[in-house]
Amino acid sequence: MNYELLSVMELEDKSKTEQTEAEEQEGAMSFWDHLEVLRWALFRSACVLAVIMVGTFIAMPYIFDRFILAPTSNDFFIYRWLNSIGGGIVKLSSDFDVQIININVASQFMTHISTSISLAAVIAFPYFIWEIWKFIEPALFEDEVKHLRPAFLGGTIMFYLGCAIGYARVFPFTYRFLVEYNLSPSITNQINLQSYIDNFTMLILVMGIVFEMPLLAWLLSLFGILRKSFLREYKRHAVVVLLISAAIITPSGDPFTLMLVFIPLYVLYELSILVVKDKKKKEDKEDD
C-alpha cells in the first residue's frame, strides 16, 4: 500500500515538473521574438525622436539666438555674473563679441537639421533609457533589478547635470580663451559655424559623460573591480589629475575659473567614494 502511494506521489511530482518545464518553455522567447521586441522598441524610439525633432526644428532659430550662440556675446549670463563678483581676480574684456561666419552654401541648412536632431536626442534621452530598461528587465534577476533601476534614474539625472555644467561653465570659458588667443596681431579670428557647433556639442556631451563617474564607480564596485579603500588611498593623486583636467578644460589661466570647473569634478570624486561599496568589508562582517 505504501509502495503504491509513493508511486502515485512520484508520478504527480513528475507530472508537475513536466508541466512547469512546459510552461517555462512556452513563456521563454526565441531569438526572433527578442528581435521583434527590439524592433518595436527602436521603432517607438524613432517615432518619439521624430516628433520631438519637429518641435526643435521649428524652435531652432529662437534656440540658436537665445542659447546656442549666447556664449559669443559679452552679455552671456555667466560673463555678467563673473564681472559682478570677480573684482580684480577675473578680468573679462568688455568688447567681447564674436561674429560667426558661414562659408558653405548648405551649411546653415545642414546645421539646422543636425542641431535639431542632437537636441531632440538629448530631450528624448530618458525615453531611450526607459525603452532599454523595458527590453533588458525580463532577463534580470530580482537583485539585479533592485540595483540597476536606481542606477538608470541616477545616470539620467547626472547626464543632464553634466550637460548643464558644460553649457554654463566649461564651454564659455574654453571658447572665450581660444577666441581671444592671438598668435600674432596681424591674424584675425573668423569662427566658422561648423567649427563652433562641433566644439559646442563636444564639450557639453563630454561633461555629460564625465558626470557619469559616480555611476561607473558604483557599477565597478558591484563587480568587485573597484573598492572604497582604493579611492581614499589615492585621493591626493586624484586631486592632482582633476586640477590638470580642469586646467586643460579652462585654459584661461586665472584661478577663479579654474576652481569653477575643478569643484564639480572634485565633488564627483567624493560622490564616487560615497556610493562605492567595499565588498571585502561586507564579506568580513558576514564571516564574523
Which residues does each predicted region cover?
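Membrane topogenic/interface segments and analogous intrinsically disordered interaction regions
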Residues: 2-288
